[in-house]
């Protein structure tokens, strides 16, 4: 006998005691399921498989992964492992808003790139370049100077935390016109 439901992972407790039933649950969680429960929801593995295909199709080689230290962190890590997605670098971050920006600054080498810009402006100011005023004006419109060592960022977060991470990326001069921003569907 097959039962469709329950919907939520929290409702799966004690279902393993009903040995003669199989439950087709709409939960997207895959960790610690009773043996007689089949997860039919969109889970992290299915999402990472789709992201993997996107990265391969677009020939994106260096992808960093940002995973919050949250209660679903292990679900995300399991999805990454099961999908066999290529990981350039994997970072875990604290979701406290004041800490996110500092961590993103470190991940993106913001201070080094900011210093590169200041050094270049000073170098041009002290040069004999006839176009130095125009060059300085153009540089002063920027926040940083120098490349990033990744092509895409996968953010495994949702709601306000996702907004905080993307805002921190923009603040550190990581722009979606230059880098792919990829997020998971909330589950």
Model feature map: region roles:
Residues 1-31:
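Beta-alpha junction/loop-to-helix N-cap segments that form part of ligand/metal-binding clefts
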Residues 10, 15, 152-170:
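Hydrophobic alpha-helical
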Residues 38-158:
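Extracellular/periplasmic Venus flytrap/periplasmic-binding protein
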Residues 173-187:
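Venus flytrap/periplasmic-binding-protein-like
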């Amino acid at each position: 006998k097959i039962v469709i439901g329950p919907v939520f992972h929290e409702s799966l407790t004690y279902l393993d005691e009903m040995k003669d039933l199989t439950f087709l649950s709409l939960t997207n969680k895959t960790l610690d399921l009773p043996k007689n429960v089949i997860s039919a929801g969109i889970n992290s593995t299915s999402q990472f498989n789709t992201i993997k295909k996107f990265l391969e199709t677009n020939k994106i080689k260096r992808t960093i992964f940002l995973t919050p230290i949250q209660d679903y962190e292990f679900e995300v890590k399991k999805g990454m492992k099961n999908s066999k997605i290529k990981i350039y670098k994997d970072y875990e971050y604290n979701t406290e808003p004041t800490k996110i920006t500092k961590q993103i600054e470190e991940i993106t080498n913001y201070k080094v790139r900011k210093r590169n810009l200041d050094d270049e402006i000073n170098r041009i100011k002290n040069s004999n370049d006839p176009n130095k005023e125009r060059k300085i004006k153009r540089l002063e419109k920027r926040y940083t100077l120098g490349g990033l060592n990744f092509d895409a960022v996968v953010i495994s977060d949702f709601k306000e935390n996702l907004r905080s991470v993307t805002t921190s990326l923009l603040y550190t001069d990581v722009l979606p016109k230059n880098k792919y921003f990829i997020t998971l569907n909330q589950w």
